Amino acid sequence: MKTGIYLSYSGLGANLIHLAYCHQVAKKYGPVTIITLCKNLKEALADDPLIENVFYLDKFTKKFFDIFKLSKILENFNFENILIFYPSLRIHLAAKIAGIKNVYSYKFYKKKNLHLIKTAKLFTEKTLNIESSPTETNFYIKKERLDKIKSEIKNDYFKIVLGVGSSGPTTRWGSKNFS
């Protein structure tokens, strides 16, 4: 059963928070395709066996006619199921127009006080009809890649690694400050 997951988040962190739920969907339906607004999610999930494909939705705006543009994109995937981890009537309609048989999404008009983890967990459990969905994410990296990194890093001095990030100019400390 070809299944898609729509993650309407531009930041890598918000997308990775949802990875545990994507894995639950993949365990039920097989490897999934993730459609996202995050530029670098594809590279982060390159080694994940439960993720078939990551599609970066580059030019998507929030106008009414964009429903039809998005539906054309979704139609190309031939999904039988799509789970939309966001309360968007626009995305839901685009999926219906694309002819996707089973469209699941958050309740519409419930964006205020939307808790990223609790809402995703409850949505996953309800949609998949499971008792409990883990909230901790498993991150897959191939052994060959880890071995290559270990061989390239010298252990004769102390290392400090900073994992800073920012999704865009509206965040507390804009992304251009990290470049």
Predicted regions span which residues?
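Catalytic machinery of carbohydrate-active enzymes
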Residues: 1-179
